[in-house]
Design a protein with these regions (language model features):
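A conserved hydrophobic secondary-structure block that centers on an alpha-helix together
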Residues: 175, 182-185
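N-terminal FAD-binding dinucleotide-binding subdomain shared by FAD-dependent oxidases/monooxygenases
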Residues: 2-12, 17-157, 173, 187, ...
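Short, surface-exposed connector motifs at secondary-structure boundaries
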Residues: 178-180, 322-323
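Short, basic, glycine/proline-bearing loop/turn elements
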Residues: 179-181, 354-355
Length: 542
């Protein structure tokens, strides 16, 4: 497809060939735009290309962790499990690209190292790692909210003689860890997924934990023909549920009852009956678990008791389980458990408390030293999380009309308009950027891309050359996001270094990164913005 804008190579350039890149290709191509999506990886898949660690799987249930623009694709693709692994999820994306003939619009093995808005020309120029340049009218980030890893500053990291890497950079050629001694720094969702798999063949697995997590059961199960038929017969309703749910998921909530108003025995019965896996337990039991501190305490104590039941050693159980007094449920994102807690019942799986008992001192040639002990390892994995929401956008210079980079603009406050555009960055969109909701990502991605496409269609229809995000609109959205955040229990996240507030980063302080007013409310705001002609933006013709 030729570009409608003769002065540029493409109407739109997107960065990132995961769900966002695929959605971008579909919707912009339908709108008649010439689009090219670049990715530094050798295959499509986004986070599922990079996170190759053993046990990597989705935490959203498969049948709504997908794009919904085609009813045919929803019917033709068959998931095999409740929570698909990395390979199956990536295969799904390849299926979408194949069926929709998206490959001609994707350029792999191409890292973008610079993006700059050229004010005189009124368009963007992107530069690749080989020095090649491309121009576009619209520059769009689909790089994802958890794609840039946090690498902790630990003394001696360059001294270790064995493999040492971040979990999201697990060797693509594979790694033989059978019979090896493995040390894992970090105890979040990645570690919860890795440990049960590694423990099957490793000589030993030692986890160095700073903050314990509220851990919910995954309760993985195979997709049966009967279950698949039920899903495919009801996909319209499933898509509608995701669009209207507070976290973009196909859950039956709200349920019309509150924990604080329910008698103790009845409350316990409801908690027990719904202990069937996934985040459903949080949303399909009571409506006040994330809003009312007392209800949250009840839920937290139930989870803590359930966790301790599965660990034979009470001392280890106490280390693994958080305390409500330290932080409430969902101040940190709870991982889903595929056998993590039970792994500590094995003699060769060890937990080390590095917050209160034996802090890390340094990495040595042969392992790791704490204030109390020395540990020898063959492999060290940094499961230390990501620079959420802003990290990928700050990883290389993205320079707007003021000459300022995004990294410079966001040094103290990460501001945006609905997570999709940023003042002083004309004709640039960010898919699920900072101050977008924390929700089922494919749902949020599609809602963002629909808004972006409608904006571009308006500009092309009306002959507009530029949109400029209004500074007052950015300030208003940032203030609204901060006000809502302050009223939630998630505001406690800075106390436990939650990545949802960027508190896990050493280069920046905690900040409000997520809109917690509800995904459905946010999607409504996007629709209202488009229906009203995008009042958050100023349009220009040159």
């Amino acid at each position: 497809m030729s570009t409608a804008n003769a002065k540029v190579d493409f109407d739109a350039i997107g960065i990132g060939a995961g769900f966002a890149g695929l959605a971008l290709i579909h919707y912009l191509r339908e709108a008649g735009r010439a689009v090219r999506v670049f990715d530094r990886a050798s295959d499509i898949g986004g986070t599922w290309t990079w996170n190759r660690y053993p046990g990597a799987a989705t935490d959203s249930e498969s049948y709504y962790y997908c794009l919904t623009f085609s009813k045919e694709l929803l019917q033709e693709w068959s998931w095999t499990k409740r929570y698909p692994g990395r390979e199956e999820t990536q295969n799904y994306m390849r299926f979408v690209a194949d069926k929709c003939d998206m490959w001609p619009h994707i350029q792999l093995n191409t890292e973008i190292v610079d993006a700059q808005f050229l004010d005189d020309e009124g368009h963007w120029r992107v530069t690749t790692g080989t020095g090649e340049t491309f121009t576009c009218k619209y520059f769009i980030s689909g790089m994802g909210m958890i794609s840039e890893p946090v690498i902790p500053k630990i003394k001696g990291m360059d001294r270790f003689k064995g493999p040492l890497f971040h979990s999201s950079r697990w060797p693509q050629e594979g790694l033989d860890y059978a019979g090896k001694r493995i040390g894992i720094i970090g105890a979040g969702a990645t570690t919860v997924q890795m440990v049960p798999v590694l423990a099957k063949t490793a000589a030993s697995v030692t986890v160095f934990q700073r903050t314990p997590n509220y851990i919910l059961p995954a309760m993985q199960k195979e997709m049966t023909p009967e279950w698949e038929k039920e899903i495919k017969d009801n996909y319209d309703a499933i898509v509608a549920k995701c669009r209207n749910h507070v976290f973009g998921m196909a859950f039956d909530s709200p349920v019309g009852r509150n924990a604080v108003d329910t008698p103790p025995e009845e409350r316990q019965r409801i908690f027990e009956e719904n202990w069937t896996g996934s985040f459903r337990w949080v949303f399909e039991t009571f409506d006040d678990l994330l809003a009312n501190p007392e209800a949250n305490r009840m839920a937290s104590e139930f989870i803590i008791a359930k966790m301790k039941e599965r660990v034979n050693d009470p001392e280890i159980g106490n280390l693994l389980a958080p305390r409500f007094e330290d932080y409430p449920l969902f101040a940190k994102r709870p991982p889903l458990d595929h056998g993590y807690l039970e792994a500590y019942n094995e003699d060769h799986v060890t937990l080390v408390d590095i917050k209160d008992r034996e802090p890390l001192v340094e990495i040595t040639e042969t392992g790791l030293r704490t204030t109390l002990n020395e540990y020898e390892f063959d492999i060290i994995v940094l499961a230390t999380g990501f620079k959420a929401y802003t990290g990928a956008l700050e990883a290389f210079p993205i320079r707007g009309s003021s000459g300022q980079t995004l990294r410079e603009k966001w040094q103290t406050v990460s501001e945006s308009i609905m997570g999709v555009c940023v003042a002083d960055f004309p004709n640039m969109f960010t898919i699920t950027g900072p101050q977008a909701p924390f929700a089922n990502l494919p749902t949020s991605i599609e809602q963002n891309v629909i808004w972006i496409t409608r904006c571009i269609e308006k500009m092309e229809r009306e002959g507009k050359d530029l949109f400029k995000p209004r500074r007052d609109a950015e300030q208003a959205w940032t203030a609204q996001t901060a006000d809502i955040h302050a009223q939630t229990l998630m505001a406690n996240g800075d106390k436990v270094n939650s990545w949802m507030m960027g508190a896990n980063r050493e280069d920046k302080g905690a900040r409000v990164l997520i809109y917690f007013g509800g995904a459905s409310v946010y999607y409504d705001a996007l629709d209202q913005s488009a229906a009203n002609g995008f009042p958050e933006l100023e349009f220009e013709t040159r």
